[in-house]
């Protein structure tokens, strides 16, 4: 091997030993005839000193520049008193350089690596191979590796088998657009890249592999956000002969073990919260329990008021009127309230009513708001009591369709929590349970809330008679307002699976065309089974404190689903298109 140690491994115990380092020149300094090189590798930094006594080596050190690749042999020694660098893991020692070999020179990088600089993300992605040299980026990928190793160890120790499933498969309706791959040997036909290994892992259960896992690549052609990529990694788990409680216990223990092993963080037992409660109290199916603010329904106090903005929704069963108390918010300036009004508008809210509670004992005179003159004081007092308002608070109101109010005030709750530094703890995990089987589209049709293979809590007859009332055997693990993973008990009975397909409007012909292989499998002794999948990228993002999953993926795509480094996607030559039986239509020319 060319090196004897990594830079980050050097410490006082190696004092007096000869070692060899390989890495990049992170920083070069010349002080009073002595040259200092900070050498960097994936494990950290080490300071190497060259003095003029070794003239040939000193001359080489004088010629090297930042990002040269070097091999250095020297002796470890303790730094002089007062020269210890507490910001470096190896800051108590340095290496007196004897030999220096330049393994490769380097041009000046497009951005500096040895200090924080405000470099645009596109530039960083264009030169990702340089961006990843930065210690903070290397630390994220190293932590990602520790996370996957911990998960694999836990699952292996608990009897799970790591089984690969196909990447080239066929399109199935899973909620997002598929990435399609044309077949050269089957003209006019296409493979689809998997959005998840869902059906294959269920088939593995039918085959008798009762504990399966896979660190799986998945693909979705969807609009991108901070927590989305066209290709992403999933910790995929499936089991047979276990119920919801068993699966949740196994995966919860896995996550608790992971956080303790990797971050030294210990969780207690995760609370369980029904979806209806999460939406009612927090306006979200993935509530952030670190924020001590809650939505409180107040329709009953506003049904008969003259203020139609409140009275209309208060009397409509499809609407919601909700209050959100912010402690100490009465001092909030009007501009800040206006900014929050614009913010909730993003979610469809038409406005943001409020009451500033200056002095409750003074009655209406102690309340500051354009709306108090339209609501009887007795009703206002009931509302203020219900939300727990005291002098110095502000209470915001939302009144509209239930979905709009929940989304708008739920998002406002999160924003207020961060803007006003209200977070009460660093980590707040929970399980969200009791999801509906279906959700209604604007046209009145139904779609599966999770996917069409989720088992309901009722019989096929009850499901078909009243599908909107059916609850599923699904569960999501949520951490700090982010969905870490979701899963369910699956349907293992053919009649139940066909009932779900019928409720979703999938004809028998379409069932056979798209899911015939699954329906066939369910005829041959499918066991009760269920599972869960965690988003690895999201998990690493949370554990590293990164602002985007792009920060924890080695070579991510941009928000327009492109790779600026390789220039993918790219144009394909005419010969390749002919072999794939594809002809491109000419784009209309802009006038």
UniProtKB/Swiss-Prot annotation:
The keyword Cytoplasm applies. L-aspartate binds at residues 174, 220, 450, 490. It catalyses: tRNA(Asx) + L-aspartate + ATP = L-aspartyl-tRNA(Asx) + AMP + diphosphate. It holds the Pfam family GAD. Gene3D superfamilies: Bira Bifunctional Protein, Domain 2, GAD-like domain, Nucleic acid-binding proteins. PROSITE patterns: AA_TRNA_LIGASE_II (PS50862). Its EC number is 6.1.1.23. Residues 198-201 are annotated as: Aspartate. One of its GO terms (molecular function) is aspartate-tRNA ligase activity. It is found in: Cytoplasm. PANTHER family: ASPARTATE--TRNA LIGASE, MITOCHONDRIAL, ASPARTYL/LYSYL-TRNA SYNTHETASE. Belongs to the class-II aminoacyl-tRNA synthetase family. Type 1 subfamily. Homodimer. This is Aspartate--tRNA(Asp/Asn) ligase. It comes from Ectopseudomonas mendocina (strain ymp) (Pseudomonas mendocina). The lineage of its organism: Bacteria, Pseudomonadati, Pseudomonadota, Gammaproteobacteria, Pseudomonadales.
């Amino acid at each position: 091997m060319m090196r004897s140690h990594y830079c980050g491994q050097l410490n006082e115990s190696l004092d007096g030993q000869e070692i060899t380092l390989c890495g990049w020149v992170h920083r070069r300094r010349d002080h009073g005839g002595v040259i200092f090189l900070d050498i960097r590798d994936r494990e950290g930094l080490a300071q190497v000193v060259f003095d003029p006594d070794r003239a040939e080596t000193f001359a080489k050190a004088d010629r090297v520049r930042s990002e040269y690749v070097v091999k250095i042999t020297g002796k470890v020694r303790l730094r002089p008193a007062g020269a210890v660098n507490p910001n470096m893991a190896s800051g108590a020692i340095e290496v007196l350089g004897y030999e220096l070999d330049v393994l490769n020179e380097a041009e000046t990088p497009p951005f500096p690596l040895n200090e924080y600089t405000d470099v645009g993300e596109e530039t960083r992605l264009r030169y990702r191979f340089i961006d990843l040299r930065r210690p903070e980026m290397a630390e994220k990928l190293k932590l990602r590796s520790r996370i996957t190793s911990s998960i694999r160890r836990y699952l292996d120790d608990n009897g799970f088998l790591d089984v690969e499933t196909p990447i080239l498969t066929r399109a199935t309706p899973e909620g997002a657009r598929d990435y399609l791959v044309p077949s050269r040997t089957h003209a006019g036909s296409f493979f689809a890249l998997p959005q998840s290994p869902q059906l294959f892992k269920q088939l593995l259960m039918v085959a008798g592999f009762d504990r399966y896992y896979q660190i799986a690549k998945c693909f979705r052609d969807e609009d991108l956000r901070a927590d989305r990529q066209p290709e992403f990694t999933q910790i995929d788990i499936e089991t047979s002969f276990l119920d919801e409680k068993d699966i949740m216990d196994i995966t919860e223990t896995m996550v608790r073990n992971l956080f303790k092993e990797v971050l030294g963080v210990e969780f207690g037992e995760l609370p369980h919260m029904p979806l209806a409660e999460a939406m009612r109290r927090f306006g979200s199916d993935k509530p952030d329990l670190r924020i001590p603010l809650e939505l409180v329904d107040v329709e009953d106090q506003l049904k008969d008021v003259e203020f139609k903005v409140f009275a209309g929704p208060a009397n409509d069963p499809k609407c919601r009127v909700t209050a959100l108390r912010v402690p100490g918010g009465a001092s909030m300036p009007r501009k800040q309230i206006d900014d929050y009004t614009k913010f909730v508008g993003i979610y469809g809210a038409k406005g943001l009513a409020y009451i500033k509670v200056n002095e409750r004992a003074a009655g209406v005179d102690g309340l500051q708001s354009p709306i108090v003159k339209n609501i009887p004081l007795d009703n206002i007092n009931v509302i203020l009591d219900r939300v727990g308002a005291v002098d110095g608070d502000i209470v915001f109101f939302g009144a509209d369709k239930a979905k709009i109010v929940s989304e708008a005030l739920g998002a406002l709750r999160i924003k207020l929590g961060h803007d006003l530094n209200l977070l009460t703890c660093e980590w707040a995990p929970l399980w969200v349970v009791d999801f509906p089987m279906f959700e209604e589209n604007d046209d009145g049709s139904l779609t599966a809330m999770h996917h069409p293979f989720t088992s309901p809590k009722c019989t096929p007859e009850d499901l078909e008679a009243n599908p909107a009332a059916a609850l599923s055997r699904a569960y999501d693990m949520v951490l700090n307002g982010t969905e870490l993973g979701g899963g369910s008990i699956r349907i293992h009975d053919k009649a139940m699976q066909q009932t779900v397909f019928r409720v979703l409007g999938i004809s028998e012909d379409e069932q056979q065309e798209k899911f015939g292989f699954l329906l066939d499998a369910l005829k041959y002794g499918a066991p009760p089974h269920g599972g869960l999948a965690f988003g690895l990228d999201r998990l690493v993002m949370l554990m590293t404190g990164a602002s985007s999953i792009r920060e924890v993926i080695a070579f991510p795509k941009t928000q327009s689903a492109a790779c600026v480094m390789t220039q993918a996607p790219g144009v394909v030559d005419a010969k390749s298109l002919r072999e794939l039986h594809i002809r491109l239509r000419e784009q209309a020319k802009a006038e």
